[in-house]
Amino acid sequence: MEKLKKNKKKLIWQQRFLYPLLFQNDFYALAYNHSLNKFNLKKIENSNLNKHFSFLTLKRLVKRIRRKRNIEELNKNYNKIFDINYNNYFYSKVIREGLAIILENFFLVQSKKKIVKKFTEWTNYQSIHTVFPFIEDNFLHSNYILNTKIPSLIHPELLIRILRRRIQDASFSHLLRLIFHKNKKLVTLNIFSQREITKLSIFLWHSYIYELEFFLVNQWKTLNYFKSLSYLISLNKTYCITKIQHVIKKPLDIKLQFFYKKKMSFHYVRYENHFIIAIKNSNFLAEKWKFFFYKFWQYYFYYLFKLSRINLKKISKNCFSFLGYVFGIQTKSIIVKSNMIHTLSKINISRKEIYSITPISSLIELLAKENFCDTLGHPISKLAWTTLTDDEIFNRFDQIWRNFFYYYSGCKNKKNLYQVQYILRFSCAKTLACKHKSTIRYVWKKYGSNFFAKSFFFKKQELISLKFFKLYPSIKKIWYLNILQINALAKLLQKKILKTNRLNI
């Protein structure tokens, strides 16, 4: 029994050290195959993530490092092995992929522990359209919207500090620090540009976001703790909370007196590096939360974050944009008639609801950049597609409209959708006319004036809408929960809106 206990202690002690795994030949193959079988990562075009990974070259590199007995020889050949600007690109790729595989498997093992199992406050959905019903249900009862963009350019030392909170191997963390500071291109968190995406950058981005959201959960737990203390109402709030602050030590040295409020709610939504928090609170406390996030980036992540980058809006007076939609609140008045014995009285009931619209002016500008129309919205021919066959031209326009219609199916103003349909329909006709060196009338005669509406998508969409709206006549919009990716035009629109908000500030 004593021998078994000693062996267990040795195994636990060995699990803390990750540095020797870099020199294990079989670990890379096993870990890489395990990750492929478990996650089934989709291919991303024009990215460094899907380049071929040669394990033969990896073994050669491991053998070379093992043979270097002298430290001076290692220092001489350091730039050849670790420098990304070196002619042989594969050395840096081997180090990057090896670190990513080790870190991924290490955190997968840690995720099964009880510490991470407690992190159940967040719901992660695959469909993007699940965000919009959540906004309609919960943001209606909020007063203010706080939105900002998560900075992606951070110092490598911050990433090392985040990883050191879970990694106990000092030599491995020193190796990470050495590689990150030597090659800053390896630790770029701009994973949304396809040219710079790597497996290591994806892992670092997720660990960075996890640290951010985990801290927010802990802060909101403290708020619920203060709400549960009933004796705080009769006592002085300022002195009582400052006493609790000295007992409960937090990572940020900020006064918690503005946290206490009876009716307080927070709703958090994030996509990529853009997040929105809906706050149900007074104007004073909402401004305090804006200041809190400013100090949060400054003291917790050591990032010089400008206060102007955090936008705070009142929902009742301003609209807010998210994922290509523009949301706002409108009041509807309902007249209720009540018959009494001698009189007939009318009662006006006002009800608030969130409406979602598509910004047609911004969409027309994006369609003009893609050469589907001009800046005024007049359709033009797509000259780059004139070399394709007629069926390929039909399929491309049909696919663009199909994705656009499904994504913006929950908007209130359907006229904007029909305007986009008009632009794509006439652009398709002009492209065919330019290809055959004829006029639009010839295209109408050959394919019919409603050729764009005769596709399989429109027939299927008409059948679904007729059956659905007959069963539910009061519903005027549909959210499709099988949409997994954001529309390309909506993504460009979101970036454009963020740029205009920065210029206005």
Curated annotation (Swiss-Prot):
Superkingdom, taxonomy of origin: Eukaryota
One GO location term (cellular component): chloroplast
Its biological purpose: Usually encoded in the trnK tRNA gene intron. Probably assists in splicing its own and other chloroplast group II introns.
GO MF terms, alphabetically ordered: RNA binding
Source organism of the structure: Physcomitrium patens (Spreading-leaved earth moss)
Higher taxonomy: Eukaryota, Viridiplantae, Streptophyta, Embryophyta, Bryophyta
Name of the protein this chain belongs to: Maturase K
Family: Belongs to the intron maturase 2 family. MatK subfamily.
InterPro entries according to UniProt: Domain_X (IPR024937), Maturase_MatK (IPR002866), Maturase_MatK_N (IPR024942)
GO process terms (BP): mRNA processing; RNA splicing; tRNA processing
A matching Pfam family: Intron_maturas2
Sorted UniProt keywords: Chloroplast, mRNA processing, Plastid, RNA-binding, tRNA processing
Subcellular location: Plastid, Chloroplast
PANTHER family with a match to the protein in the record: MATURASE K
Chief localisation class: plastid
